[in-house]
């Protein structure tokens, strides 16, 4: 505690046991006879002036477990000539040198061989003029920020450290200008193998869904909770571990899609609190293909084995907290046990199940196979895929050719197996330690293929009620057909939550999350589901040349949608499959290219595509004498 041994002139030697995690401010203030201090592994926090003015100290060895060394704990210790900092990650300081008010010309700072650049750049530690490499090999490595570990060629085969990847309460601004709490991101390289005794990582797939804000893309990371952000491990060399533990964090009372980078027995998923109730289910692709909706999700038993790279759904409840923590251990004696350390491409086999309707065929629930963030554009896959938004409790479709969607560690998602494709390969180049999309030009295979295709125009529409939001997409592509194509389209999956609003397009009785089609007559049926009575807003995220007119048949209204103009309507709970129609005005062949003189000459009537029509018996928007006319 503060001032516990202050001004104790009889104290000449001190041993700090491993049970002590914190030494508070001024604890050994002005102990004038203190010559020797031995810190044990386990010390985490060392605060201001803890050893103020202890001038008899000549050497300080700080343990590898130390995370905070704030407020100059060794202020005025002028006798110190050697400081050995054994933490691989420099302990955070308040900006001041841990050894302040001392002539640092006479002091040498010794640090681990992997950490020289980190210490010379770190606040406080950069005050030391002389930094040399220590012979000490840390046995405990706690990674709570970005760290690049290059294994030395001369590393002993007996060296087996314990590595804990975790989060930090320290906030910093990253290279993308975002202010976030730091978390452990470890990249391992080198020609020698890194053999680890114990490794622990943190996986929190739901962290990307920002529970306090609503954003157009349907997800945003929650930067204000230090204990939910996932860590990232990227292995570019060779790494193994005797024991691995995943700390899995799930939000309470919501379904979460999860995957694991190794095989797991259900009984090896252990709640950290005994009061946690939970269930995990597998996906039956054959039942979905057969249209047996009630049999799609299968309850799993304690003896079932969850396969690496496959997807599952979890639901949990913990009465004392908003989220639940689990310890997850890999299945012993499994060939996939060390897959978490894979430095190569990963391939996931896809199951094929024929169906009467193509939109039900061969849906597979798979997952990010790496213990790091992954750029979906690097998958050997160019068809749409479906993710579960655990905040909105709905499905959202993305296309690697159009979207820079970043998969979280432990995140599962749906893909529909295309014809002739038996597997998906995750290229190792897609691995990354952060959650932001990289800027690139045709590096990813899906993006390159899209660039070589016909011109594709994308329209994203959202339906919003209060803080809940859902999205559908229309893509115009002359190479597409009006029929459902697994390589281009994505069926709309209904949410399991009855109160969640949903939006989709409709064609030939099929509901689409992504509807890629030729322009044809420029009309697309739009369906909505309103889970509760209330007000709803339909919005368009961008305008791409075409004008988008939303027709509300119930209200006999037409509204031009744009970035600045949405449409709000009231509705009772229920489905509305015939109420809305989207009219797309193709300006390349539409109104602007019609010869106005010809129109005026015979009082002709044209539709929005510039095609002459014989009558206006149907409701819609028409052009007469160069002016738009609405027929209600």
Model-identified regions with their sequence ranges:
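Active-site-adjacent structural elements in enzyme catalytic domains
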Residues: 220-321
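Surface-exposed repetitive/solenoidal architectures
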Residues: 29, 115-159, 248-251, 259-262, ...
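Extracellular beta-strand-rich, repetitive "passenger/adhesive" scaffolds
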Residues: 3-11, 26-34, 49-57, 72-79, ...
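Compositionally biased Ser/Thr/Gly- and acidic/asparagine-rich
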Residues: 257, 265, 292-307, 311-611, ...
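Extracellular, surface-exposed repeat/solenoid domains
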Residues: 81-120, 522, 541, 547-553
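Structural signature of tandem-repeat unit edges
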Residues: 8-22, 32-45, 54-68, 77-92, ...
């Amino acid at each position: 505690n503060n001032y516990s041994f202050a001004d104790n002139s009889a104290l000449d030697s001190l041993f700090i046991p491993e049970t002590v995690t914190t030494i508070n401010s001024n604890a050994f203030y002005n102990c004038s006879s203190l010559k020797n201090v031995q810190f044990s592994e386990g010390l985490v926090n060392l605060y201001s002036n803890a050893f103020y003015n202890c001038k008899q100290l000549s050497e300080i060895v700080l343990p590898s477990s130390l995370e905070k060394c704030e407020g100059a704990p060794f202020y005025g210790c002028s006798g110190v000539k050697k400081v050995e900092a054994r933490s691989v990650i420099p302990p955070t300081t308040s900006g001041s040198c841990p050894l302040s008010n001392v002539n640092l010309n006479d002091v040498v700072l010794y640090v681990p061989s992997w950490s020289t650049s980190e210490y010379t750049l770190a606040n406080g530690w950069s005050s030391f003029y002389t930094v040399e490499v220590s012979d000490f090999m840390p046995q405990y490595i706690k990674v709570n920020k970005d760290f690049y570990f290059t294994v030395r060629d001369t590393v002993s085969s007996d060296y087996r450290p314990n590595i804990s990847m975790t989060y930090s309460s320290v906030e910093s601004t990253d290279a993308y200008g975002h202010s976030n709490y730091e978390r452990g991101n470890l990249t391992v390289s080198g020609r020698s193998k890194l053999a680890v005794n114990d490794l622990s990582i943190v996986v929190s797939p739901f962290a990307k869904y920002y529970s306090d804000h609503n954003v157009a893309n349907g997800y945003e990371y929650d930067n204000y909770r230090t204990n939910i952000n996932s860590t990232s491990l990227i292995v570019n060399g060779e790494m193994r571990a005797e024991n691995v533990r995943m700390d899995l964090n799930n939000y309470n009372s919501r379904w979460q899609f999860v995957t694991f980078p190794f095989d797991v027995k259900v009984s090896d998923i252990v709640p950290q609190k005994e009061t946690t109730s939970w269930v995990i289910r597998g996906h039956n692709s054959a039942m979905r293909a057969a249209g047996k909706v009630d049999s799609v999700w299968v309850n799993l038993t304690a003896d079932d084995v969850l396969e690496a790279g496959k997807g599952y759904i979890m639901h949990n409840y913990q009465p004392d907290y908003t989220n639940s923590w689990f310890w997850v251990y890999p299945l012993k004696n499994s060939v996939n046990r060390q897959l978490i350390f894979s430095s190569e491409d990963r391939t996931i086999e896809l199951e094929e199940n024929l169906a009467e309707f193509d939109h039900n065929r061969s849906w597979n629930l798979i997952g990010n196979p790496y213990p790091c963030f992954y750029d979906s554009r690097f998958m050997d896959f160019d068809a749409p895929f479906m993710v579960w938004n655990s905040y909105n409790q709905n499905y959202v479709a993305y296309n690697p050719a159009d979207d820079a969607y970043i998969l979280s560690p432990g995140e599962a998602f749906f893909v529909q197996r295309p014809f002739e494709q038996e597997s998906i390969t995750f290229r190792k180049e897609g691995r990354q330690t952060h959650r932001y999309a990289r800027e690139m030009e045709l590096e990813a295979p899906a993006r390159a293929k899209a660039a070589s295709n016909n011109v594709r125009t994308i329209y994203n529409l959202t339906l919003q009620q209060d803080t809940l939001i859902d999205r559908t997409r229309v893509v115009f592509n002359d190479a597409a057909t009006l029929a459902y194509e697994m390589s281009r389209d994505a069926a709309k999956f209904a949410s399991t939550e009855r109160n969640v609003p949903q939006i989709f397009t409709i064609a030939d009785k099929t509901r689409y999350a992504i509807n890629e089609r030729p322009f044809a007559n420029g009309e697309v049926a739009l369906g909505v589901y309103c889970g509760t009575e209330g007000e709803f807003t339909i919005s368009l995220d961008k305008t791409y040349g075409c004008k988008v007119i939303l027709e509300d048949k119930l209200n006999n209204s037409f509204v031009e949608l744009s970035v600045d103009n949405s449409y709000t309507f009231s509705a009772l709970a229920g489905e509305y499959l015939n109420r809305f129609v989207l009219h797309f005005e193709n300006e390349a062949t539409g109104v602007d290219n019609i010869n106005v003189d010809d129109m005026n000459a015979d009082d002709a009537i044209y539709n929005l595509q510039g095609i002459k029509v014989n009558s206006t018996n149907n409701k819609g928007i028409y052009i007469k004498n160069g002016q738009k006319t609405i027929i209600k």
